[in-house]
Amino acid sequence: MGLVLASESARRVELLRRAGYGFEARRSGFPEVVLDDPRETAVANARGKAEAVASTLPGEEVVLAADTVVYLPGEPGGILGQARDAGDVRRMLGLLEGRTHEVHSGVAVAGGGRVAVRHAVTEVRMRRLEPGEAEWYAACGEGVGKAGGYALQGRAAVFVEWIFGDYTNVVGLPLPLTIRMLRRFGVRPG
């Protein structure tokens, strides 16, 4: 039984490899949606990605998909997806600095005619940034393509005061949840 990761995200690939899994990574091609609720958004996108890839596979493969969004409670349109460019990174950091936000991930596993979907949430507190820090970070390019416009495992680690919950969720794939789900589908590391 093979494992297929419905993502080409370097962070998800690295996390899953570190956990000891062998797999093939594939782009899902699923058009992501943004709903009113961050949990529903992450879960709907994870399910859509898993089902899109599973529908192209003929055999016994198990498909793993995930979606991560950053949510800023109390902010109109508080769901922050992936930063598109340096300007987007600066804008998102401006919203997040000095506040606590939530990182929501949906995880979906499909195989054998069934789909399981779960959700993880982690709280992150970002400190107030010094003048020029947002520009410095945006210029390095690391935040482009990242939910909320930052990468906790990279240079943005210096902006974070604390996290409450699963660190790997903030990186892009909540490993404890993912491993439990994969086990239920008969997939183990090694």
From Swiss-Prot:
The Gene Ontology biological process terms listed for this entry are: nucleotide metabolic process
What Gene Ontology terms describe where this protein resides (cellular component)?
cytoplasm
User: What reaction gets catalysed by this protein?
Assistant: dTTP + H2O = dTMP + diphosphate + H(+); UTP + H2O = UMP + diphosphate + H(+)
Q: What is its main location?
A: cytoplasm
Respond yes or no to whether keyword Isomerase is given for this record. no
Q: Where is this site: Important for substrate specificity?
A: 11, 68, 153
Q: Which SUPFAM superfamilies does the annotation name?
A: ITPase-like
GO terms (molecular function) for this protein are: dTTP diphosphatase activity; UTP diphosphatase activity
**Which residues carry out catalysis?**
67 (proton acceptor)
Question: Where is it located?
Answer: Cytoplasm
CDD domains this protein is in?
Answer: Maf
Record Pfam families: Maf
Instruction: Indicate yes or no for the key word Hydrolase.
Output: yes
What's the cofactor?
Answer: a divalent metal cation
Q: Which residues form a coiled coil?
A: none
EC number from the UniProt entry = 3.6.1.9
- Keyword terms, alphabetized: Cytoplasm, Hydrolase, Nucleotide metabolism
Question: What is this protein's function per UniProt?
Answer: Nucleoside triphosphate pyrophosphatase that hydrolyzes dTTP and UTP. May have a dual role in cell division arrest and in preventing the incorporation of modified nucleotides into cellular nucleic acids.
Q: What family does this belong to?
A: Belongs to the Maf family. YhdE subfamily.
Identify this protein by name.
dTTP/UTP pyrophosphatase
